[in-house]
């Protein structure tokens, strides 16, 4: 593959730090990452942030179709040129912000669940992950690169200081595995830390069909919004439909000590709190909650 440095310099493009741009420049690493997707000729891929096409080209060689979604308009023509040079006719390059793109529409058009692939910039990785969680009916699996710090947060267990909202959300609805670690010298420009490749296989229904998911996600957001507060104080500050004293009673009923912090609770604890909240608060709207 033509190196990202060569492609960028040929178009007088400098990487933007504000977009977290670190381009994968090792073809063997790119092939390995795409292999971890387990693609077949029936699969439709959505690639987030294709850049200069390091992952796009091998993915298109194995999948039925690739939708390459790039927010940086400067990279659109270079990416299209790379696709044409590879002789591929199964790639759609889209100049869009992934956070303003409803992948469920692509899923409906494709007629099957999607495989999501990408090298995600640190500044927006958590938002993209939560968006995938909430739209997971459209996604079968994802293989994503993250800076090591975020990868550790994703995989952190309860009780770990890295454990947080995204850890709970993914444990609720997916199986995760770290499949590779990449050194900074495999990117241009070099990031300051290692990157990790995480494979995520989504479970559309995690066995909790009675769970109000919107309420569940609102609850974990409130629980981790102020990490140093006790779970009672965090939830009563973020979800005010019931009083702090009622929150204490609710938590005791849910077999959760009101004085612990959110980082000590597992998915089952949050689901139990959620069920007791619904029972105590009655039929209130999640938006109001």
Curated annotation (Swiss-Prot):
Q: Which UniProt keywords apply?
A: Cytoplasm, Methyltransferase, RNA-binding, rRNA processing, S-adenosyl-L-methionine, Transferase
Source organism, top-level taxon: Bacteria
Is ATP-binding among this UniProt entry's keywords?
A: no
**Top-level EC class:** transferase
State the Gene Ontology terms under molecular function: 16S rRNA (adenine(1518)-N(6)/adenine(1519)-N(6))-dimethyltransferase activity; RNA binding
Q: What does the UniProt entry say about where the protein is found?
A: Cytoplasm
Residues annotated for S-adenosyl-L-methionine binding in this entry? 22, 24, 49, 70, 97, 119
What is this protein's function per UniProt? Specifically dimethylates two adjacent adenosines (A1518 and A1519) in the loop of a conserved hairpin near the 3'-end of 16S rRNA in the 30S particle. May play a critical role in biogenesis of 30S subunits.
This chain's protein is named Ribosomal RNA small subunit methyltransferase A
Upper classification of the organism: Bacteria, Pseudomonadati, Thermodesulfobacteriota, Desulfobacteria, Desulfobacterales
């Amino acid at each position: 593959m033509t190196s990202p440095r060569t492609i960028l310099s040929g178009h007088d493009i400098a990487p933007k730090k504000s977009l977290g741009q670190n381009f994968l420049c090792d073809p063997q690493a790119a092939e390995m990452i795409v292999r971890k997707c387990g693609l077949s000729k029936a699969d439709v891929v959505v690639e987030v942030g294709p850049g200069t096409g390091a992952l796009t080209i091998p993915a298109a060689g194995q999948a039925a179709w690739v939708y390459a979604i790039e927010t940086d308009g400067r990279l659109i023509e270079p990416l299209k040129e790379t696709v044409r040079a590879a002789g591929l006719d199964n790639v759609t390059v889209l100049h869009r912000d992934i956070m303003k793109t409803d992948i469920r529409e692509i899923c409906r058009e494709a007629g099957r669940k999607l495989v999501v692939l990408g090298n995600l910039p640190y500044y927006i990785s958590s938002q993209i992950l939560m968006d995938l969680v909430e739209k997971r009916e459209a996604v079968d699996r994802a293989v994503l690169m993250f800076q090591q710090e975020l990868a550790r947060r994703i995989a952190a267990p309860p009780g770990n200081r890295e454990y947080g909202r995204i850890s709970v959300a993914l444990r609720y609805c997916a199986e995760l595995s770290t499949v590779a670690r990449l050194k900074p010298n495999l990117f241009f420009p070099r990031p300051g830390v290692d990157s990790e490749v995480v494979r995520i296989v989504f479970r559309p229904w995690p066995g909790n069909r009675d769970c109000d998911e919107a309420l569940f996600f609102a609850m974990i957001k409130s629980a981790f919004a102020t990490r140093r507060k006790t779970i009672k104080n965090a939830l009563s500050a973020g979800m005010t439909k019931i009083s702090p004293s009622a929150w204490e009673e609710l938590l005791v009923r849910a077999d959760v000590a009101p004085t612990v912090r959110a980082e000590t609770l597992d998915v089952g604890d949050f689901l139990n709190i959620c069920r007791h909240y619904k029972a105590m608060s009655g039929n209130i709207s999640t938006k109001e909650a």
